[in-house]
Amino acid sequence: MDYRQAGVDVEAGREFVSRIRQQVESTFRPEVMGGIGGFAGLFEIPAGYKAPVLVSGTDGVGTKLKIAQAMDQHHTIGIDLVAMCVNDILTTGAEPLYFLDYLATGKLEPAQLADVVTGIVEGCKQSGCALLGGETAEMPGFYGAGEYDAAGFAVGIVEKSQLLNGSQVNIGDVAIAVESSGVHSNGFSLVRKIIESNGWQWSDCLPEWGGQSLGEIFLEPTRIYVKPIQALLKSGINIHGMAHITGGGLPENLPRCLGQGQSIQVKAGSWQPLPVFNWLADKGQVNSTAMLETFNLGVGFVVLVSPEQRQTTLDFFSGQGLVANQIGTVIEGDGAFVWLD
C-alpha cells in the first residue's frame, strides 16, 4: 500500500503547483524575496516608514463555497477570500502587503483549485498585495466529493502616527456608507435556506433576474475597497474611522470603529438597499430586524469624517464611480448602535 492508495495524490499536488506558479508570481511586488515553493515566504518591509506597524487579518468565505461547488464555478470565490481579509485590515488605514491562502479538500482536483487561485490572484491584483504563499491540504475522508474549504491571511502596514484605532473619532462625525456589490460573503446560511425552502436550484433562472441564474447572482464577488480607500487616505480628507460591514451587519460592525464614550446613530431610509436584499426579505419572509442584523443591505464599507468634510467625501466617492450616502452620526454613548426609524 502507498500514499496514493490511501487517498493522497502527490502527483496531483505537483500538477496543481505547476498550473498556478505563473499566476502567483504575477502578483509579486518588489519587496518579495524569492519564488514559490520554499518553506516560508519572505517579504522585505517597504522603505520610507519611520515607525511601521504591521496589521494582520484572517477570514474565510463561509457557506458561499457551497454555491460555487454546486455551480462548479470557482473563479470568483478567491476574490471573496482576499476581499474579506484585506477590507478588514484596511479599516486601520493599512496598505495590504501580502496574502497567504489555505485550501483543504478531500481529493485534489488541480483544475478546480487552480480556478480558486485564479480568483485569489485577481483579488491580490485589485488590492495591490502579493500572493506570498499558501498551503493545499488533501484530506481523504474529511470532505465529500468536489468539496473544499478556503481560508486567507493578509498582512498590511501603516505608519504608527496614521493608525486608525478609534481615538480620532469625535462626537458629531458623520458616517459615509459606500455601496456593496451584493451580499458579499456573509449571511449565506440564511440565503441557502431561503433558496432551498422555495424549492429552487442554483441553476434556476427566475424572470425577475433577467436571465441570470440564482447561482450567478449570489456568487457576485465581494467588493475590494483598497484602491478607493487608499486614494481617499492620500487625498487630504481627514478620515477618523472606518468599518468593513460583514457578519452581523451594520449593528455589529459600526460600533467597532468608535472611541470611548461614543455610539453610532443610523437613520433608516438614508440609503437604498440593493434589490437582492428586498428579494431575500420577501422570499424568505425575513423581518427587517433580522435583515439588518444579518446582511450588509447594500453598505459594504463606512468611513467617519467631520461634518465639514462630508460633501468632499461624498464627491470623492462619486468620482471613483461608487455610490455613497451619509447614513448616520456619532453620538455620546456606550458603544451602542442606535437605529432611527
From Swiss-Prot:
Transmembrane segments: none annotated. It comes from the Bacteria. One of its GO terms (biological process) is purine nucleotide biosynthetic process. It catalyses: 2-formamido-N(1)-(5-O-phospho-beta-D-ribosyl)acetamidine + ATP = 5-amino-1-(5-phospho-beta-D-ribosyl)imidazole + ADP + phosphate + H(+). It is an enzyme of class 6 (ligase). CDD domains: PurM. Gene3D superfamilies: PurM-like C-terminal domain, PurM-like, N-terminal domain. The keyword Ribosomal protein does not apply. One of its GO terms (molecular function) is phosphoribosylamine-glycine ligase activity. Keywords: ATP-binding, Cytoplasm, Ligase, Nucleotide-binding, Purine biosynthesis. GO terms for cellular component: cytosol. It is found in: Cytoplasm. InterPro entries: PurM-like_C_dom, PurM-like_C_sf, PurM-like_N, PurM-like_N_sf, PurM_cligase. It holds the Pfam family AIRS. Its EC number is 6.3.3.1. Pathway: Purine metabolism; IMP biosynthesis via de novo pathway; 5-amino-1-(5-phospho-D-ribosyl)imidazole from N(2)-formyl-N(1)-(5-phospho-D-ribosyl)glycinamide: step 2/2. Belongs to the AIR synthase family. This is Phosphoribosylformylglycinamidine cyclo-ligase. It comes from Synechocystis sp. (strain ATCC 27184 / PCC 6803 / Kazusa).
